[in-house]
């Protein structure tokens, strides 16, 4: 503990653990995602045999709309989510997370809130919905509202595909170690935003000084593989995957309709992208990328597939996910656009499920709208 919670050694070890966690997630998930997407693509022959008697329009809607979107989201998020949650559960099981909260307590005290917020931020790193629900541990309602409204500034697992793809464009190559460092920097950037907004909200709420943070550091424990796998896979990964798949299917159908219906020689989706080009350029992006963020409202994992589909002008059933950074670069996405996308991905509205959790936990539409607007 003298080393792990030391003023000088503690933050360095914490940052190193984050880098190693992200690096192992990237190394393990890259090939798995390619294999998974390849397996989904090979089902096309089986699908054509089963649906051969269907009307062509219906078969195309099911394959290039519902199925392709759901398969793409699954291939993008399942491997990194499973690996990340397993590694994160190891840190949780050995008793490190309370020590991470102890390291940041003095920072939160200066911001007028409690060190317990660090635990909710760690939960938000996996899923912001879980982080918002975890804000129940905050001792006062004011501190709970502050923690809830700032939790979405921590990039969750669903935003990793966007951060990694744009990060690879910014770096000019796909290097796992450099991307792990970039992810760590994104988390630190989000944490900095959390500290700043927490400080402002604590002043606006005119609350009393934070109550003393009494934290009992649990003893170190040997990791229990069975418990870790059960909690990480069944308790977290499959829960997040099922939520993403449930919203990906109808979103895919809507995307298919917008891509199929032609007006004036252009699809509705392309016309919408052209309409939003002005707003996108103000943010350093373009209309296609902005649409990707808008369609990511149900699930953040939808952003990159939608952006690739618009920029490459291919359907989700034919546009390959592998080499997303190379495809983005080939479509004219430069370093400036990638950098703006990285910043916007860290600081943008929460997903719909997180907004529902915020509405449920706060019981206030005003705080829900504020939490959506703050990032």
Residue ranges and their predicted role:
Residues 2-54, 60-93, 175-199, 242-252, ...:
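Hydrophobic alpha-helical transmembrane segments
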Residues 42-50, 98-128, 207-232, 312-323:
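Juxtamembrane inter-helical linkers in multi-pass membrane proteins
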Residues 30-69, 111, 131-147, 252-375:
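Extended, low-charge hydrophobic alpha-helical regions
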Residues 125-131, 150-166, 184-194, 298-304, ...:
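Membrane-embedded alpha-helical segments of transport systems
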Residues 203-211, 220-264, 274:
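Long hydrophobic segments that form regular secondary structure
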